[in-house]
Amino acid sequence: MKSRLGLLAFGTFLLGIGAMIHAGRQAVPAGDTVVLVTLDGARTEEMFGGLDVDILASTLKAGQKLEELPVYKRFWAPSPEERRRKLMPFFWTLVTEQGSIAGNRRLGSAVQLGNAHWFSYPGYSEILLGEPHDAEIKSNDPIRNPYVTVLETLRERLSLPSDKVATFASWSVFNEIVEHTEGATYVNAGVEPLETPRTDIHLLNPLQAEAATPWDGTRFDAFTFRAAMAHLASARPRVLYVAYDETDDWAHDGRYDRLLESFARTDTYLKDMWNWLQSQPEYRGRTHLLITTDHGRGHTASDWRDHGAKIEGAQETWIAFASPRMPRRGEWRNAPTLSTSQVAATLASRMNVDWNAERPRAGRPIH
């Protein structure tokens, strides 16, 4: 009898331990969602000051007048605050009324890259790992990430199906960047067809293949946005990453007019996504949005097209937040310097996952 009672007690103990472990893995408010959005190579100058008139003037062709350019008429205003609101009206309403943004150095707030390379793959890997790996991640080649990313860990810790952790990216190399184990999460990057039950989205698949961009392995951001929204509506992910690319592509091409237009389009994408999320009961008041960039660019008319370790300014980034569990502080002022390495832990913390327990060297979460 004692043996049977002992076995029963031991079994109850094991069940209790199992429940505690399960609770630890699932310790997140039901329905909470994190959304990460990146704007490739988006300079602090445009984010905080809108149109840079010196750079626009440097792109004038013979016979052109600055005041006659369509983008000047559309985006110019006397003050940086007015110009940035003309460029990204929704974004600035969101971060000033419902969130915050760090990185305006004029106000004593800075965000820095931790990696030494100051270009895309190292920057994105730093975002998703919470730490730089300069010796191993030192090119933009499509090489599988040697480390497990925060996206993969969130899927495992929250016991989610792969389609509940999804990445939509304009650049094809995100297939390798976001996963150490191929297929661990859902990834749609570059000119990949979207698998969806929605017949209206099926029309996008041949269209994005036919609408070739000037850049190899990259689709236009409009397709990335539509694909992400289709997946959001049909699969209802808990972790979503949307990576836009045109803010970098047009800069490399020296098309400052197109660059400004891409900022403005991205603002409409953010608006449409945020408004849709807030219209859905399962996402309203439960969605944690973080917006940032993988690197900065040069400060001047001679180097704004470029980035990399030799370009001063390319290490300067910014981070914006809209979260029900973060203070609504608008622009950060006179604050300690933040690092891009803190993004991974910040995302994980919103789902009550301790990323620093997984990667002790990673940056700490931002609160």
Per-region residue spans from a language model:
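Metal-dependent active-site segment of extracytoplasmic phospho-/sulfohydrolases and closely related
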Residues: 34-36, 44, 265-305, 347
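Histidine-centered active-site microenvironments of extracellular/periplasmic hydrolases
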Residues: 58, 292-322
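Long, well-ordered early-domain segments
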Residues: 72-178
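Non-catalytic, well-ordered alpha-helical segments in soluble enzyme domains
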Residues: 151, 155-157, 325, 334-367
